[in-house]
């Protein structure tokens, strides 16, 4: 039998509402985080609108902070942001998914300022943001937002993803965007790919590092980042649309001899019922594969492709 001094729900209930209220007031006088949590609970009694107001104010306050967060304050900050996430999902989302979606998006966007002024090497804050991101797609579907607005928001967030807070966003938004939205998003990134990155005059170029190949210039690194961003976005959109040829188009010809790239292409061709083309894609990388190395996906996809063509007896050949 548990002691009457054990901290559990049954024992606390024996104190009565008045005494518990007094104790909580004493606690919140010295604990700001507990105070904010109680404010959220009180706001929830008046409906999701009051909770939304409290959450919005807290997110704005966190976003405005500029002081560096010491390592011992990272966990409390993570708990604070997690409390806002839970309030959004538990008190707002069930009755007002559109408002919940807006607030959750703002919460995830906090990653940019927050991770800029703290050391999250243990991933404490990153886990909170990733948890919020994981339900964003379902919340967007429930909110039934206009497709054009959602396209613009996804585009802007993918482009402003310095800390990886929106990693995998296109995939998560596949359902709420729909085919039309995905194609509209693709057009935006295709237009971005056509943008010419202007190189500043040599005397104005900023050196950011040195390597065996020479000097690293800021504009060159930015151009490469731009190219990677666009290519990855178009790859994600191609996969979301099930457009194998669009995926292949994003794989440079000189990289298709890499067994890992060849396997990625072949796997998609196989899923599209194009087993013969999958074998051809794998064959293009066989020379490098035979030189050694560990290429489990190449082997796995080749076996599956041969089996699909009715050549299971050849699956282990070569």
Model feature map: region roles:
Residues 1-318:
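Eukaryote-biased, non-catalytic alpha-solenoid scaffold regions
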């Amino acid at each position: 039998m548990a002691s009457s001094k054990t901290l559990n729900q049954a024992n606390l209930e024996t104190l009565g509402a008045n005494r518990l209220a007094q104790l909580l007031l004493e606690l919140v006088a010295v604990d700001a985080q507990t105070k904010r949590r109680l404010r959220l609970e009180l706001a929830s009694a008046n409906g999701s609108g009051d909770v939304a107001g409290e959450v919005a104010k807290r997110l704005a306050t966190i976003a405005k902070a500029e002081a560096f967060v010491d390592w011992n304050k990272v966990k409390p900050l993570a708990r604070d942001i997690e409390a806002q996430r839970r309030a959004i999902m538990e008190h707002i989302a069930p009755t007002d998914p559109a408002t919940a979606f807006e607030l959750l998006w703002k919460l995830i966007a906090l990653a940019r300022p927050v991770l800029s002024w703290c050391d999250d090497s243990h991933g404490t804050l990153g886990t909170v943001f990733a948890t919020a991101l994981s339900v964003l797609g379902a919340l967007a579907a429930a909110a039934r937002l206009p497709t054009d607005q959602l396209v613009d928001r996804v585009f802007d967030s993918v482009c402003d993803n310095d800390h990886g807070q929106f990693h995998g966003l296109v995939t998560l938004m596949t359902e709420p965007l729909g085919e039309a939205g995905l194609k509209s998003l693709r057009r935006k990134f295709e237009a971005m790919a056509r943008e010419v990155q202007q190189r500043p005059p040599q005397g104005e170029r900023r050196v950011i590092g040195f390597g065996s190949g020479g000097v690293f210039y800021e504009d060159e690194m930015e151009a490469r980042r731009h190219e990677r961003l666009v290519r990855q976005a178009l790859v994600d959109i191609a996969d979301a649309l099930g457009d194998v040829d669009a995926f292949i188009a994003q794989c440079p010809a000189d990289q298709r001899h890499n067994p890992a790239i060849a396997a990625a292409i072949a796997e998609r061709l196989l899923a599209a019922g194009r087993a013969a083309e999958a074998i051809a894609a794998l064959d293009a990388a066989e020379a490098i594969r035979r030189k050694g190395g560990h290429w489990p996906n190449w082997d796995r996809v080749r076996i599956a492709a041969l089996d699909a063509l009715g050549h299971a007896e050849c699956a282990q050949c070569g």
